[in-house]
Regions:
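Hydrophobic ligand-binding cavity/cleft-lining segments
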Residues: 1-46
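Alpha-helical scaffold segments that form or flank carboxylate-/histidine-based iron centers
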Residues: 9, 46-47, 103, 144
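Hydrophobic pocket/interface hotspot
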Residues: 21-25, 59, 77, 88, ...
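Tryptophan-centric aromatic hotspots in well-structured domains and transmembrane helices
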Residues: 25, 32-33, 48, 80, ...
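A solvent-exposed, acidic/Ser-Thr-rich amphipathic alpha-helical stretch
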Residues: 39-60
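A conserved amphipathic terminal alpha-helix motif
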Residues: 94, 122-166
Length: 166
């Protein structure tokens, strides 16, 4: 069992079927994922965030830096089961070699559409003074990560809603 200080769980319900939600989440991630230094390595600079949609594919961020074009791999897909779920190994830009966390994204049909659930775990394996924690420990850090994922899932829900209205 995963300890409570190791797991972030956030769910949102979107008004579309699981197959469409899966495609919008994975293929249109650059359109709904928030911008700015809290959400993208490139910060406010123009760039593209995208999944390579397959087992072993990557979550990439491509952008122009002062030293030229950059491509940063933030994740590697470890399970790919459209339209039900996928998992990827997530690495922050300040992670050392061998450090990673795991993100699972599940798409479940519900009467009002699709429940999309994010489970982000593996935090307990990182040292208490790891830079990704920004000085926060245990439950306080998990709360911050829950708010971060909550902001992203709100963006996803708004994106799906706007798309359905157009």
């Amino acid at each position: 069992m995963t300890p409570p200080s190791d797991l972030v769980t956030v769910s949102v319900t979107v008004s579309t079927d699981p197959a469409t939600a899966f495609v919008l989440f994975t293929q249109d991630i650059n359109l709904w994922w928030r911008r700015g230094p809290n959400f993208r390595i490139a910060g406010k600079q123009p760039g593209v965030l995208r999944f390579e949609p397959r087992l072993g594919g990557r979550l990439l961020e491509e952008f122009e830096s002062p030293s030229g074009p950059e491509v940063v791999t933030t994740g590697t897909i470890t399970e790919w089961q459209p339209p039900a779920r996928f998992r990827f190994e997530w690495r922050g830009v300040n992670f050392a070699p061998g450090e990673s966390t795991q993100v699972e994204v599940v798409f479940e049909e519900v009467p009002t559409g699709t429940r999309v659930t994010i489970r982000h775990s593996g935090w307990a394996a990182l040292p208490p003074d790891h830079p990704v924690r920004h000085g926060q420990q245990g439950p306080a850090f998990i709360r911050i990560m829950g708010l971060w994922w909550g902001d992203l899932m709100t963006s996803f829900r708004e994106f799906v809603t706007d798309r359905a209205g157009s």
